[in-house]
């Protein structure tokens, strides 16, 4: 295996910092609702209630309830976009408001870019149009089908709605894509873009989308929410999927300070590898190399890591590989550093899951509290997994991990607030 791919997120005179968070998760809409539930160790997993799903073998998921896209998104965008893009448009609005970033802060539309990640695309919109095609004929298929299903739809619609004309793109790296999108945003900032809106949202719970996922052996078929997603335990039986996601505002530090923005965190380092689909034993080396690459880029020693947000797939072989990868990369510190996986309370939102973890990591560093891992009690690996209740701490450096079902591995290092040139 060759060395990990580093994206150049750390170092250099132009430092990428996080100034705004926008969250839509099964815990609720907005940062406050999400953080309260995460800090309390609440689980929002429940029975799948979407229409047309009752006959499917997937019984438990993390649904976003009470979301009304019309409250934040204009009709002209709603009619041509899927639910996953509705999430992205709304989360972007929340993130920009959180960053206090408005039209007056945009020197030029070319100074603001958009990077998202997507794994399932517009399945709900696509299902409706396919039903029109086969039930009524091609004349009943709307023109927006050609764009609404596409993975890049959210990037395009966010940029159009906000008149952002800087570097734009979409990352297709399976579940690791969320971290990779943030890394690409940081790289764009380092290369001269002042601001990048980045993140991932997913809506994979329409019947058509669920059917497409049933081929994943890693998908949990458990029928009880408290048993469906329990990584790092002997009872692990896969993961429960989820919808929702998060969008972040990433800015060049000097530009952010000039406009008086609060620097929430610094994107210090990132690296990625690829080990192939379903090869969970091999993912040990790939993930370890990604961790080592991210730490090297951040100029971070293993013992400086204060908290790890685990990928936590919920498959015994994959969980074992992740625990061993942490030991390989962090050495003795791997058994001492607090590890958490709050996604067990929301479900695994594919590309959006690690972006939610990044948002949660920023909040954990700000609040001095490491959230617990819901549903997990008896850990069968040599990890200090935070369970039961949140743990008071003063984390200043967070390591966020992500792996995709197709073999992508990604690691990201965040530092609390601004980081002086000499490091921590």
UniProtKB/Swiss-Prot annotation:
Domain Ketosynthase family 3 (KS3) per the UniProt entry, residue ranges: 13-416
Keyword set, alphabetical order: Acyltransferase, Antibiotic biosynthesis, Transferase
EC number: 2.3.1.-
One GO BP annotation of this record: fatty acid biosynthetic process
Record-linked InterPro entries: Beta-ketoacyl_synthase (IPR000794), Ketoacyl_synth_C (IPR014031), Ketoacyl_synth_N (IPR014030), PKS_Beta-ketoAc_synthase_dom (IPR020841), Thiolase-like (IPR016039)
Pfam families, alphabetized: ketoacyl-synt (PF00109), Ketoacyl-synt_C (PF02801)
GO molecular function terms listed in the Swiss-Prot or TrEMBL record: 3-oxoacyl-[acyl-carrier-protein] synthase activity
Enzyme category, top tier: transferase
Residues spanning the membrane: none
Extra remark beyond the main annotation: This putative ketoacyl synthase lacks the active site cysteine.
Sequence similarity: Belongs to the thiolase-like superfamily. Beta-ketoacyl-ACP synthases family.
Physiological role: Involved in developmentally regulated synthesis of a compound biosynthetically related to polyketide antibiotics which is essential for spore color in Streptomyces coelicolor.
Record-given protein name: Putative polyketide beta-ketoacyl synthase 2
Organism: Streptomyces coelicolor (strain ATCC BAA-471 / A3(2) / M145)
